[in-house]
Amino acid sequence: IDIRNNFSPEYEIPKDKAKIVSELRKAASDSKTVWLASDEDREGESIAWHLASVLKLDLASTRRIVFHEITKDAISNAILNPRQIDMNLVNSQQARRILDRIVGFEISPVLWKKVQPSLSAGRVQSVAVRLIVEREREIISFKSESSFRVTGLFYPDTSELPENNTIRAEASKKFRDDKEATAFLELCAPAEFSVSGITVKPGTRSPAPPFTTSTLQQEAYRKLGFSVAQTMTVAQKLYEAGKITYMRTDSTNLSKLALTKTRELIIAEYGEKYSKTRQFKTRSKSAQEAHEAIRPTYPETSSVTGSQNEKKLYELIWKRTIASQMSDAEVERTTILIGMNNSPVTFTATGEVIKFDGFLKVYSESTDTENGEDEKYILPKVEKGMNLLYETITATQKFTSPPPRYTEASLVKKLEELGIGRPSTYAPT
């Protein structure tokens, strides 16, 4: 890179690739037309441009085609719609590449001296390490605080304990120490409890969008225990076998054909009321959206042959894609307030009842369990003023927790939120 000459890059062919280049040049010279079918994003466009340059191709007559899935229809359509190389994408890739080299060449020697030889520092790697270090410092400096929370299991005042009819509720007040908590428990022992209020609110839950590279990596980590690198290796095999669309993408869009096929499948399998066609807006700050979202090439195929990991990942992609085009789930969220006759402290119970399962019939998105449990309890039917008995009331000491260390999934999520890196960089990083 010639920094003094407007950062002009100079490219060299590696010695071990000279034979391949020679063979390609001969094949190109013997051909009437050369078709370049590298990926549609800026990295793929740069590859096409480098090939044209090395093979000394006439850009005006060279056919540039792109497709996002290895199917007969997709390839045929690409051949019918060739275009020229997009130099805007090429220049964009060159700028990123030059920045990568400048950052790496400047920082890596410092690592060799201060840490150990052969370490590398990249534009994305360095930021990822910084995030991990900052989180570790937060954990080290965190000071835990304790309190006591009181929870009770209540049930309607009937002659016997009804099965599956208990209400788990938590006291609205937190107690500073064991002495305060014990005093409150002594107050609860002879107390009379009743339902002082009920709030019922209808609500909906919407499906997650189809997978991008980063969301596939995150969900495969949560649901399947796959590392980021493992996910990309398995996805590559599925793509090369023509089972899924291109696996390096930051788009959540589906093609019109995919939407039609998915809708037909949902109506046939689950009925019209379960179908809701929708497109999702990509949230990533740096999204190129050169491709579709990651989806099955044939939505009607719910399973594939292959290794167990390939089957698992395909099923995950299939379910997520189908669910994204299904109706919202309809829920009823209930809050029950329980009062006591000898204290202003109330107990609160919350629960959720699914009235219509919608997309949940097929798929439910996982989340990083960094903030504790997120269970949805089904509450028994009660009325305001109804007397309640308690089965148990206990006090538990709780400690505030430091922020958790990043997992591979949560680190990828953070990088994406900050607009750092591209789908192709997350696995190597």
Region locations from a protein language model:
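Conserved short loop/turn motifs at secondary-structure junctions
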Residues: 39-40, 116-120, 200-209, 219-224, ...
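Long, highly charged, low-complexity internal segments
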Residues: 1-13, 121-236, 271-276, 305-425
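Intrinsically disordered, low-complexity regulatory segments
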Residues: 1-97, 106, 402
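Conserved nucleotide-binding/hydrolysis micro-motifs of P-loop NTPases
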Residues: 40-44, 68-73, 154-159, 250-254, ...
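A generic secondary-structure signal for well-formed alpha-helical elements
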Residues: 54-59, 106-110, 192, 239-248, ...
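C-terminal or mid-to-C-terminal helical accessory/interaction module adjacent to the motor/catalytic core
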Residues: 23, 49, 70-154, 197-204
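Extended, well-ordered alpha-helical scaffold/bundle regions in very large, multi-domain proteins
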Residues: 226-288
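Core structural elements
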Residues: 95-107, 124, 152-156, 203-215, ...
